[in-house]
C-alpha cells in the first residue's frame, strides 16, 4: 500500500515537473495542456485553484484559454523566472498532500519549512558569494549610467554637513581580495552558549531579555557605527567622486560607446562594487533604472497598439522596426508610403505615432542613453537583482528553524507565537543583508543577535495594551533589575528613594516610572471561584448619584414643599421663583416683579418677610436636620 502511494506521488511529481518545463519553454500554458498533463484524479477544485494561482503569481507563467501567436509575449513585462518556476514546482509537489490534512497555520508553516535542507559552512559561503555576485552585477551595470550615482554622492554631501547619517547610506565596504578568516573555535563557544541559554531557567531568560531591551536602542547603531570608519568612508567617497566626474567628462567628450568611455565606466564599476549600500539606498538605485525603462516600454506599447493591434502590421515587422530604429522617426514616412494593406490604416494615426516617438526621443535626451543602451543596462540590473534575491531567499529559508528555536523562548510575553516568528524573520532578513562571510563566522552565530533584537523590540513595542515608548521600556527593565538586586541585598522591597539613589535619577521620575510600569487589568476579570462577578462590579461609578444622596434630596424636596405650604400663596410663589424651586432656573427681582406687576423693591420686601417666617423655630427645625454638621 505504501509503495503504491509512493509510486503515485513520484508519478505526480514528474507530471508537475513536465508541466513547469513546458510553461518555462513556451512562456505560457493553456487550460487544455494542464488538463492533459495532470491525471484526472489530481484535479481537485481546491488544488486546481492553488495550481493556477502558483503558476501565474509565483512562477510568472500566464495561463491562457488558447495558444497565442508566436510573438505574443514580445513586450510583456512578465517573464518566467527560472528559480521562481523551480520554487513553484516544489510548492505544487507538496500542496496536494497538504490540502485537507491540516488548517493550522503553525503546522503548515513548520511542514513547509521542513522541506528545506540545513546549510553547511561551505553552503553558506557559496550562497553569500552568489548574493555578493548579484549585487556586484547590479552596481557594475548601474555604473554604466554614471548619472544614476548623483543622488548617492549628494546624500554623502549631506552626511558631511551633518544632515544625514552615514549608517543610513552604507553598511560598509568590501575588499574583494580579502581572504576568509577562520573562527571555528569561537563558533563552538557560541554554540555552547546557545545550548546553555536553551537550558537556563525563566528568570535568567528574563534578565537576558531585559539586558537586550536595555541596550537595543544603542546596539543597532553602535554595531553599524563601529564597522564604518568615517575617515575610510571619506576616502572611498572621494575616490568614487573623482572617478565619477572623470567618467562623465570622457562620455561628454568622446561619447558613451567609445573605448575611452568604456574603460572609465569599468574603473567606476570596480570602485562602486566596493560599496555596500543599505537596502533602501540600493532599492532606490534599482528603482530609478526600472522607472527609466518603464517609460520606454509604455511608449513602445502605445506604438504596438497602433501598428499591430489597430493597423494590422505583422509583429515580426514591428519588432524589427523598434529594435532597429529606437526613437528615430524616419521609418514612419516609408511605412506610410508602403503598398502593404496596413499602411493606409496608419495615416489616421500618424500624429500619435510621431508623439510616441517624440516621447522616446525626449527620454533619450534626458538620460543621454539610446533605447538599446537603456534596455541593455536595465536587463543587466534585473539579472543581477534576481540572482541576489534568489540567493537571499535560499539563505533565509534554510535558517527559518533558527527563528523558531529563538522565538520559543519568548512565548507568553504578550505576542502570539506566529507574530514572534514573523518579527524574528524580519530580523533574519536584516542579518542576510548585513552578513559578511569573509569574517569567518557561521551565519547562525551572526543572525542570532539580529533575530533576538527584532523579537525583543517587537515585544517592547507591541506587547502592552497601552503602548509605551521603547526607551521607557528600557528604563522600566533597568528599574526592575535593580529592584531585585536591592531585594536580595536588604531582604525587603526598596523604596523609591533608595531606587532613585541607586539609579542616579530624581525620585519623582522613579515614581513616574513605577506608575507607568503597572499593567492594565481588564474589568471583566472574574472575582472569586465562580464567574458570576467581575472586577468591574466592585468599581464605584462616579457618574451616578449615591442612593443615600438621592434619598436625602428627595426628603429635602418633600420637607421644602411642606414648609412652603405654611406661607401665603404669594410668598410661596415668590420664593419658588427666586430660588428656582420646581423650576428650570431661578429669577431676578426684576423678572419676579414683572410677573406680579410690582416693583423690584416690593418683591424684595415680600421675599424678606417670607424668609423671616421660615426662620421661626417652628418651621426651621424641619429643614435644619438636612444641614451638614
Swiss-Prot record:
Residues 187-228 have a biased composition (Acidic residues). CDD domains: Sigma70_r4 (cd06171). It is found in: Cytoplasm. GO terms for biological process: DNA-templated transcription initiation. One of its GO terms (cellular component) is cytoplasm. Keywords: Cytoplasm, DNA-binding, Sigma factor, Transcription, Transcription regulation. Residues 589-608 bind DNA. GO terms for molecular function: DNA binding; sigma factor activity. A motif (Interaction with polymerase core subunit RpoC) lies at residues 419-422. It comes from the Bacteria. Residues 474-550 are annotated as: Sigma-70 factor domain-3. InterPro entries: RNA_pol_sigma-70_dom, RNA_pol_sigma70, RNA_pol_sigma70_r1_2, RNA_pol_sigma70_r2, RNA_pol_sigma70_r3, RNA_pol_sigma70_r4, RNA_pol_sigma_70_non-ess, RNA_pol_sigma_70_r1_1. Residues 395-465 are annotated as: Sigma-70 factor domain-2. Residues 183-228 are annotated as: Disordered. Residues 563-616 are annotated as: Sigma-70 factor domain-4. It holds the Pfam family Sigma70_ner. Its main location: cytoplasm. Interacts transiently with the RNA polymerase catalytic core. Sigma factors are initiation factors that promote the attachment of RNA polymerase to specific initiation sites and are then released. This sigma factor is the primary sigma factor during exponential growth. Belongs to the sigma-70 factor family. RpoD/SigA subfamily. This is RNA polymerase sigma factor RpoD.
Amino acid at each position: 500500500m505504501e509503495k503504491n502511494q509512493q509510486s503515485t506521488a513520484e508519478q505526480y511529481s514528474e507530471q508537475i515537473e513536465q508541466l513547469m518545463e513546458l510553461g518555462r519553454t513556451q512562456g505560457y500554458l493553456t487550460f487544455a495542456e494542464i488538463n492533459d498533463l495532470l491525471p484526472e484524479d489530481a484535479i481537485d477544485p481546491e488544488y486546481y485553484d492553488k495550481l493556477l494561482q502558483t503558476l501565474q503569481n509565483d512562477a510568472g507563467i500566464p495561463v491562457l484559454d488558447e495558444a497565442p501567436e508566436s510573438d505574443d509575449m514580445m513586450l510583456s513585462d512578465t517573464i518566467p523566472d527560472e528559480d521562481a518556476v523551480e520554487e513553484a514546482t516544489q510548492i505544487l509537489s507538496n500542496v496536494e498532500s497538504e490540502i485537507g490534512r491540516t488548517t493550522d497555520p503553525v503546522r503548515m508553516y513548520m511542514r513547509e519549512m521542513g522541506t528545506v535542507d540545513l546549510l553547511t559552512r561551505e553552503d553558506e559561503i557559496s550562497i553569500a558569494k552568489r548574493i555578493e555576485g548579484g549585487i556586484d552585477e547590479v552596481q557594475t551595470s548601474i555604473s554604466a549610467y554614471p548619472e544614476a550615482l548623483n543622488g548617492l554622492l549628494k546624500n554623502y554631501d549631506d552626511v558631511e554637513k551633518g544632515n544625514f547619517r552615514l549608517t543610513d547610506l552604507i553598511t560598509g565596504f568590501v575588499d574583494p581580495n580579502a581572504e576568509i578568516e577562520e573562527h571555528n573555535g569561537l563558533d563552538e563557544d557560541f554554540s555552547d552558549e546557545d545550548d546553555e541559554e536553551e537550558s537556563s531557567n525563566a528568570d535568567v531568560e528574563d534578565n537576558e531579555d531585559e539586558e537586550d531591551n536595555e541596550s537595543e536602542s544603542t546596539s543597532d547603531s553602535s554595531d553599524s557605527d563601529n564597522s564604518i570608519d568615517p575617515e575610510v568612508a571619506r576616502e572611498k567617497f572621494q575616490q568614487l567622486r573623482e572617478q565619477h566626474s572623470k567618467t562623465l567628462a570622457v562620455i561628454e567628450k568622446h561619447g558613451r560607446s567609445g573605448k575611452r568611455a568604456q574603460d572609465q565606466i569599468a574603473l567606476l564599476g570596480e570602485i562602486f562594487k566596493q560599496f555596500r549600500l543599505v537596502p533602501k539606498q540600493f532599492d532606490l538605485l534599482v528603482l530609478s533604472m526600472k522607472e527609466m525603462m518603464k517609460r520606454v516600454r509604455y511608449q513602445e506599447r502605445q506604438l504596438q497598439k497602433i501598428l499591430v493591434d489597430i493597423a494590422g502590421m505583422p509583429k515580426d515587422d514591428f519588432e524589427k522596426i523598434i529594435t532597429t530604429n529606437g526613437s528615430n522617426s524616419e521609418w514612419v514616412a516609408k511605412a506610410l508610403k508602403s503598398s502593404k494593406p496596413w499602411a493606409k490604416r496608419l495615416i489616421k494615426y500618424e500624429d500619435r505615432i510621431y508623439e510616441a516617438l517624440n516621447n522616446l526621443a525626449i527620454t533619450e535626451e534626458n538620460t543621454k542613453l539610446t533605447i538599446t543602451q537603456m534596455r541593455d543596462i536595465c536587463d543587466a540590473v534585473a539579472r543581477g537583482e534576481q540572482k541576489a534575491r534568489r540567493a537571499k531567499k535560499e539563505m533565509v529559508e534554510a535558517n527559518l528553524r533558527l527563528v523558531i528555536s529563538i522565538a520559543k523562548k519568548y512565548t507568553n510575553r504578550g505576542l502570539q507565537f506566529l507574530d514572534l516568528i514573523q518579527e524574528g524573520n524580519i530580523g533574519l532578513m536584516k542579518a542576510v543583508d548585513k552578513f559578511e562571510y569573509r569574517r569567518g563566522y557561521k551565519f547562525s552565530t551572526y543572525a542570532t543577535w539580529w533575530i533576538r533584537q527584532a523579537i525583543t523590540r517587537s515585544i517592547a513595542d507591541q506587547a502592552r495594551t497601552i503602548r509605551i515608548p521603547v526607551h521607557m521600556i528600557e528604563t522600566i527593565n533597568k528599574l526592575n533589575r535593580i529592584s531585585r538586586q536591592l531585594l536580595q541585598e536588604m531582604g525587603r522591597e526598596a523604596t523609591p528613594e533608595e531606587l532613585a539613589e541607586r539609579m542616579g535619577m530624581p525620585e519623582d521620575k522613579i515614581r513616574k516610572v513605577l506608575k507607568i510600569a503597572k499593567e492594565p487589568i481588564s474589568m471583566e476579570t472574574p472575582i472569586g471561584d465562580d464567574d458570576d462577578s467581575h472586577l468591574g462590579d466592585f468599581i464605584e461609578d462616579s457618574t451616578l448619584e449615591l442612593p443615600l444622596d438621592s434619598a436625602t434630596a428627595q426628603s429635602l424636596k418633600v420637607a421644602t414643599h411642606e414648609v412652603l405650604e405654611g406661607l401665603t400663596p404669594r410668598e410661596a410663589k415668590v420664593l419658588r421663583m427666586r430660588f428656582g424651586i420646581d423650576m428650570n432656573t431661578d429669577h431676578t427681582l426684576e423678572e419676579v416683579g414683572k410677573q406680579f406687576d410690582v416693583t423690584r423693591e416690593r418683591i424684595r420686601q415680600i421675599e424678606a418677610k417670607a424668609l423671616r417666617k421660615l426662620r421661626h423655630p417652628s418651621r426651621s427645625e424641619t429643614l435644619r436636620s438636612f444641614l451638614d454638621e
